[in-house]
Amino acid sequence: MKSRVRKSKYTVHRKITSTPFDGFPKIVKIIVTDPCATDSSSDEENDNKSVAPRVKRYVDEIRFCDEDDEPKPARKAKKKSPAAAAENGGDLVKSVVKYRGVRQRPWGKFAAEIRDPSSRTRLWLGTFATAEEAAIGYDRAAIRIKGHNAQTNFLTPPPSPTTEVLPETPVIDLETVSGCDSARESQISLCSPTSVLRFSHNDETEYRTEPTEEQNPFFLPDLFRSGDYFWDSEITPDPLFLDEFHQSLLPNINNNNTVCDKDTNLSDSFPLGVIGDFSSWDVDEFFQDHLLDK
């Protein structure tokens, strides 16, 4: 008869614990074997099925070592400050501040370039020793191309220009017109007496010249005719003074028969005795106000 060989599954669980110790290093192991170990509680329910038995072995290992031999936890690397990075030449490339339109070359120089929106191309501005010089070169090019809309690093763009609305100056057309045209314009009547807008009807209005009837002129009578006497007129003067001296005192000047010589003295023919002496005349009586005397 052949003997049946029973197979079993053997597993080892090891746990290591390290503790500090002043003396020599020592190791303590605790081993436990479980021949009837099961993976889960469901294995006990399936009794009808033939399942290979499991054997588990638990090993606990305790190590006693010195404090110097104890492994230290890994420390986190601290980031260097920009000041410390500036002291070290190797870290200078990594701590450079980035500016708009500036790039650093592998050999350490700084290049500046800008994009031209009109041509849609990049303009090369040159290579500079420092990043600040390259940034200033970019700012100048941006202000020259974009004006007040430029985005700069250091330089301040110019202010936007203010749009001033200038008042429109009226256009005055001066035309020289003849006397006939000005007379015609004066005859044009306005539609409204209060209207301030003048307009011309030269294209639509026809001018007609109509004869005007002249009124009968009024002729004044010839008061001073070349007649027999100098004062002869249709209006009879007041006979108080003129009739008395007309015929007797005044000579007939306009008479053709009378010839006056240069040596003729008219004062001889004019009797002054009729008037009297001038010193005897009371002139003040003529200028007195009779109303005040009353």
Swiss-Prot record:
Keyword annotations: Activator, Cytokinin signaling pathway, Cytoplasm, DNA-binding, Ethylene signaling pathway, Nucleus, Transcription, Transcription regulation
Function: Component of the cytokinin signaling pathway involved in cotyledons, leaves, and embryos development. Probably acts as a transcriptional activator. Binds to the GCC-box pathogenesis-related promoter element. May be involved in the regulation of gene expression by stress factors and by components of stress signal transduction pathways.
Gene: CRF5
Pfam families cross-referenced by the UniProt entry: AP2 (PF00847)
GO terms of molecular function: DNA-binding transcription factor activity; transcription cis-regulatory region binding
Source organism per UniProt: Arabidopsis thaliana
Compartment annotation: Cytoplasm; Nucleus
Keyword Cell inner membrane: no
Induction: By cytokinins.
Name under which the protein is recorded: Ethylene-responsive transcription factor CRF5
A GO CC term assigned to this protein in UniProt: nucleus
